[in-house]
Each structure stands twice: as C-alpha cells, then as structure tokens.
Design a protein with these regions (language model features):
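Short clusters of hydrophobic/aromatic residues that line enzyme substrate/ligand-binding pockets
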Residues: 27, 55, 138
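Conserved beta-strand and immediately adjacent loop positions that scaffold enzyme active sites
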Residues: 32, 100, 130
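Active-site and channel-lining beta-strand-loop segments
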Residues: 25-45
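Short, flexible segments with low predicted structural confidence
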Residues: 6-7, 37-38, 63-64
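Active-site-adjacent loop/helix segments that line or gate small-molecule/cofactor pockets in enzymes
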Residues: 1-31
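Conserved PLP-anchoring active-site segment centered on the Schiff-base-forming lysine
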Residues: 121-139
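Glycine-rich loop-to-alpha-helix module at the N-terminal edge of alpha/beta enzyme cores
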Residues: 42-126
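A structural signal for well-ordered alpha-helical scaffolds and beta->alpha junctions
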Residues: 5, 9, 59, 85, ...
Length: 139
C-alpha cells in the first residue's frame, strides 16, 4: 500500500491537536535543501525546518555527530552537566565575548528562559518584573 500525502494528512487530523494550520504535505525524506513528499514530489525547503536545518537536511557531518552522540548519551536534564554542553558553551562564550550562554532547544524554551532571566534581573535590582507581550503572538 502506498502511503500518500492525502492518507497521512487525514490520519494526522484524527490524532494531532489542531493548534495551528497544517499543510496537506507529508515529507518523508530530505537531502541538502531538497525535500520529498509521500507522493514522490521534490521540493526546495525554503523554511529550512523553521531555520533549524541551516546546514540542510542530512548533512553528513551533522548525521555523524548525532549518531556518535546518540551512541554515548541521548539526553539528560539541564540539572546535570555534560561534556558537549560544556564544550559548546565555552565556544559560544569565547566567540561572542559574553560571560554566559543559555542553551535551549526551541523558541518556546528560549522565550521562557528570557522571561525568567529578565524577572531575576529585575528582582535583584528591586525593579518591576512586568513582562509585555504581543496579543496572539506565537512565542
């Protein structure tokens, strides 16, 4: 049985919470800046996976690094230290001249972290901790 874009889209609608509009495309493969859907049609990925695939899909060095890391340790909480986190934090501090970095894996975590940092900063200075946001904004 061929699993088509239409089939996957309809099945997805049965189970996936509709918090935002999804397109009736099911991408099943990526290479560089190209994507292929379930019907075999080729596309240029103009979104780069919402900017997280800035080296393209399945870049050999990224695939190798992910495979190597997954073979050692998949994930631990930020409550603990890991060698890759120490290395990338040092690299970013050295490159930017900043004192510290805060690593996250999503826009939502980045915004939540920024709010907490801003509130902590304001609290230490006995200033207001009010946060202003845009109505109906995504993050």
């Amino acid at each position: 049985m061929h699993i088509s874009n239409e089939y996957l889209y309809e099945e997805d609608k049965k189970n996936y919470l509709p918090t935002f509009k999804r397109f009736p495309l099911a991408f099943i493969k990526g290479k560089g800046s190209r994507l292929w859907d379930a019907d075999g049609k080729e596309y240029i990925d103009m979104l780069a996976g919402i900017a997280v695939n800035n080296l393209g899909h399945c870049h050999p060095k990224v695939v190798k690094a992910v495979q190597d890391q997954a073979a050692e340790l998949m994930h631990i909480s930020n409550f603990f230290v890991s060698p890759p986190q120490v290395a990338v934090s040092k690299l970013l501090v050295d490159l930017t001249g900043l004192k510290h970095v805060f690593l996250t894996n999503s826009g939502a975590e980045s915004v939540e972290g920024a709010i907490k940092i801003a509130r902590k900063y304001a609290h230490k200075r006995n200033k207001g901790g009010e946060i202003i946001s845009m109505k109906n904004s995504f993050h």
